[in-house]
UniProtKB/Swiss-Prot annotation:
One of its GO terms (biological process) is cytoplasmic translation. Keywords: Ribonucleoprotein, Ribosomal protein, RNA-binding, rRNA-binding. GO terms for molecular function: rRNA binding; structural constituent of ribosome; transferase activity. InterPro entries: NA-bd_OB-fold (IPR012340), Rib_uL2_dom2 (IPR014722), Ribosomal_uL2 (IPR002171), Ribosomal_uL2_bac/org-type (IPR005880), Ribosomal_uL2_C (IPR022669), Ribosomal_uL2_CS (IPR022671), Ribosomal_uL2_dom3 (IPR014726), Ribosomal_uL2_RNA-bd_dom (IPR022666). One of its GO terms (cellular component) is large ribosomal subunit. Residues 32-58, 225-277 are annotated as: Disordered. This is Large ribosomal subunit protein uL2. The lineage of its organism: Bacteria, Pseudomonadati, Spirochaetota, Spirochaetia, Spirochaetales. HAMAP family: Ribosomal_uL2_B. The keyword Ribosomal protein applies. The gene is rplB.
Length: 277
């Protein structure tokens, strides 16, 4: 998928870039049976208070139901019917039509095409788009949509252009290197999909103007030093100030390098090397 640029007919178009969408199937609306309504909460919790700042507005979306598991379709071949855009994630999605007639969406791997036949299960061939237990995937292969708990469905490596690499297999665990640089152990019966995720140019897209952020449901981010003392620890003062202290969050938590991870987490024993800072 290439990057599309615009002639600067207006100042807002000068730095704006978008994806070309040439690789997507033409004229395909999302399958109605695999979509549902999505109500935006505008960052509010159940009591109506803001729990996540800078959310609100944006274009309406239908949520596409994605199959992150693929366990109940072991050894049933599926044909790729279309590759579609999904407004709810950075990756594209692929519509699979199984031999038994059922249709499902999955995250679209890189280099798959309409008409390809995919499969899942321990005996599936080593091929891009096929889902297998980690113990059945050769060392050195790239994978995505990795399970952390057997049967829960893929939780790791699900965004555009993402991939992880199988480094080793020993006993009940497989060593996997994630794109963040973290190296961790994952139970060998957990399922992963072979290959990288497509739409790798997503990271190079420039929003270009404030209005597009609003289309995506993102509201402005106001600096703490521009607020009043009642709103932020950096607020107040006569004229422009530096904030007068080390950077903190609105609730006084030190930021910019302060470690917030719990010192004793159950998952520490599975992490061989922490992610790159």
């Amino acid at each position: 998928m290439g990057i599309k640029t615009y002639k600067p007919k207006t100042s807002s178009l000068r730095y704006k870039t978008t994806l070309s969408f040439d690789d997507l199937s033409k004229g395909n609306d999302p399958l109605k049976s695999l979509t549902k309504g999505k109500k935006f909460k505008s960052g509010r919790d159940s009591s109506g208070r803001i729990s996540i700042r800078r959310r609100g507005g944006g274009h309406k979306r239908k949520y596409r139901l994605i199959d992150f598991n693929r366990r109940d379709k072991f050894s049933i071949p599926a044909r790729v019917a279309s590759i579609e855009y999904d407004p709810n994630r950075s990756a594209n999605i692929a519509l699979l039509v199984y031999k038994d007639g059922e249709k499902r969406y999955i995250i679209s791997p890189k280099d798959i095409k309409v008409g390809d036949v995919l499969e899942s299960g321990p005996n599936a061939p080593i091929k891009i788009g096929n889902a297998l237990p980690l113990e059945n995937i050769p060392i050195g292969r790239t994978v995505h949509n990795i399970e952390l708990n057997v049967g829960k469905g893929g939780q790791l490596v699900r965004s555009a252009g993402g991939y992880a690499m199988i480094l080793a297999s020993d006993g009940n665990y497989v060593t996997v290197k994630l794109s963040s640089g973290e190296v961790r152990l994952i139970f060998k019966k957990c399922i992963a999909t072979i290959g990288e995720i497509g739409n790798e140019d997503y990271v190079n897209v420039s929003i270009g103007k404030a209005g597009k952020s609003r289309w995506l449901g993102r509201r402005p981010k106001v600096r703490g030093v521009a607020m009043n003392p009642v709103d932020h620890p950096h607020g107040g003062g006569e004229g422009k100030t530096s904030g007068g202290r080390h950077p903190v969050s609105p609730w006084g938590q030190p930021t910019k390098g302060y470690k917030t991870r719990k010192k004793k987490r159950y998952s520490d024993k599975f992490i061989i090397k922490r992610r790159n800072k």
